[in-house]
Amino acid sequence: TYTSPALTQDTWFRRLSSATIGLITCTEITDTVKVTVINFDPGSVSGAQTICENGTPSAFTSSQNALGDGLITYQWQASLDGTSFTNITGATLKVYAHGAMTTDTWFRRQATSTLNGFQCIDYSGAILVTVNNMTPGSISGTQTICEDTTPAAFTSVPATGDGIITYQ
């Protein structure tokens, strides 16, 4: 058997066999076999962004489409930890628009190149959509007062969330 090193282009192989008896060597060459290399680049995506809770992110775009020798297909995937990705049902175009979000989520695009029934699969880099979660808190102190009278102080429960919180 023979194990070839990694290939980057189509390569043909054949074997030379020799048999020697005494001073006589006979040599024969086998038929050739071809290893077809599917040249493939999964491309890249862009669209990392920060949105407000329940907001809809801008569509993720294809910075570079996948390139390959075969038929190229796409499948978008999502992950809450940036490591374990799952397919997004129906998300099979080179661009993707996600609905409203409440949780930070990583997205990546799987590209598949199919040639002669063989598939090569690779992934774009992952992009993160950061969700700025915030609870507005509350105020109370509804009252009725006379004209030119100062109302009693309002009471409040502070807002909580990601980032710096300010009030107006």
Question: Which residues does each PLM region occupy?
Answer:
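Conserved Ser/Thr-centered positions that define the repeating blades of beta-propeller domains
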Residues: 1, 14, 76-79, 108, ...
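Surface-exposed, flexible coil segments in extracellular/virion-facing regions
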Residues: 1-6, 77-99
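Exposed beta-strand face motif in extracellular beta-rich ectodomains
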Residues: 9-13, 103-107
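Short, solvent-exposed loop/turn segments at the edges of extracellular beta-sandwich modules
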Residues: 18-26, 112-120
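Terminal edge beta-strands and adjacent linker/stalk segments
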Residues: 25-38, 119-132
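Proline-enriched interdomain boundary motifs that mark the N-terminal boundary
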Residues: 38-48, 133-142
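A short beta-strand segment in extracellular, disulfide-stabilized domains
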Residues: 55-65, 149-159
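Solvent-exposed loop segments of extracellular immunoglobulin-like
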Residues: 65-75, 160-168
